[in-house]
Amino acid sequence: MSVLLGQILDALGGELVGGDREMPISRIAPLDSAGAGDLSFLSNPRYRQQLAASEAACVIVAPAMRELAQQRGACIVVPDPYAYFARATQWWKRNCRSVAPAGIHPSAVVHESAIVDASATIGPLCVVEEGATIGAHTVLKSRVTIGENCHVGARCLLHSGVVLGADGFGFAPENGAWVKIEQLGGVRIGDDVEIGANTCIDRGALDDTVIEDGVKLDNLIQIGHNVHVGKHTAMAGCVGVAGSARIGAHCTVGGGAIVLGHLQLADRVHISAATVVTRSLTQSGVYTGMFPVDENAKWEKNAATLKQLHSMRDRIKALERQLQQSADQGHNGTQ
């Protein structure tokens, strides 16, 4: 299927330079693989060499790349090419791809007390338990489970295998055994949230686990009980957030990072991949806490040295004191 370039411009705006609105567009493609009939984009100037070599019919660029793009061919000039590209993909999916109709798939199991908005889509083999609510235009892909008394807002997208409202990990030690702490809270998901495949968000022990509006969670993320995630925070795959952690708004957490329980992250904190957050972070900024990769033999030597840092610090301080004493004695001797 193809569309006219002018249809995209009418929907999304942008300045067309050196091109024809009647140009047919068959797909949206990366710069390096785009061919005739494809729409592509350049958001990072580092890839300008790919722009010159690209065979795309039209390329979305920033004003700074306008002249270079014109030399190659047709372009759409916009202030933020990456955001324009994102909206172009949304437009393409709405207009060029089949979309599951609203409604509940016959194989889904929805409790009679659950409230599902008429515009929501509940996919095959989903389970929506007692007292749960699903908001307007929300989509549950196949095999999603929404536990009892869990609530999902409007315009959310939950991918296959998501589980909301499994019991949080709560046990009290008693006489060498474990006594289960019943998890009496729920999960509350705000509006415009996307949750990746096989991500699990546990219900709260007493209060709810809360995911605020606009949060984006990748695949295979574990959110423990009583966690609170602020608006428009994004987490990459395999992140783990332990119970009762509170993460601010507009944060990012890189893949495989871990946030320990009961910690607080301020707004606009950005955690690098594979970092283990062991203390609260009260100031916005970028934080990294991981041991870098190296050849194994070198890594083992550095790891062994790392264990000796405390004693090495004491030795260095002692040497500094000795040097200072020697310098003081020499200075006194020359007077």
From Swiss-Prot:
Pfam entry (one): LpxD
Stored InterPro entries: Hexapep, Hexapep_transf_CS, LpxD, Trimer_LpxA-like_sf, UDP_GlcNAc_AcTrfase_non-rep
HAMAP family in alphabetical order: LpxD
Transferase as UniProt keyword: yes
Protein name (database record): UDP-3-O-acylglucosamine N-acyltransferase
Any one GO CC term of the record: membrane
Pathway assigned in UniProt: Bacterial outer membrane biogenesis; LPS lipid A biosynthesis
Record-linked NCBIfam families: lipid_A_lpxD (TIGR01853), PRK00892.1 (NF002060)
Assembly information from the UniProt record: Homotrimer.
Alphabetical UniProt keywords: Acyltransferase, Lipid A biosynthesis, Lipid biosynthesis, Lipid metabolism, Repeat, Transferase
Enzyme Commission number(s) from the entry: 2.3.1.191
SUPFAM superfamilies documented for this protein: Trimeric LpxA-like enzymes
GO MF annotation list: N-acyltransferase activity
GO annotation (BP), single: lipid A biosynthetic process
Active site residues according to the UniProt entry: 225
Role of this protein: Catalyzes the N-acylation of UDP-3-O-acylglucosamine using 3-hydroxyacyl-ACP as the acyl donor. Is involved in the biosynthesis of lipid A, a phosphorylated glycolipid that anchors the lipopolysaccharide to the outer membrane of the cell.
Annotated catalysed reactions: a UDP-3-O-[(3R)-3-hydroxyacyl]-alpha-D-glucosamine + a (3R)-hydroxyacyl-[ACP] = a UDP-2-N,3-O-bis[(3R)-3-hydroxyacyl]-alpha-D-glucosamine + holo-[ACP] + H(+)
The family this protein is said to belong to: Belongs to the transferase hexapeptide repeat family. LpxD subfamily.
Highest taxon, organism lineage: Bacteria
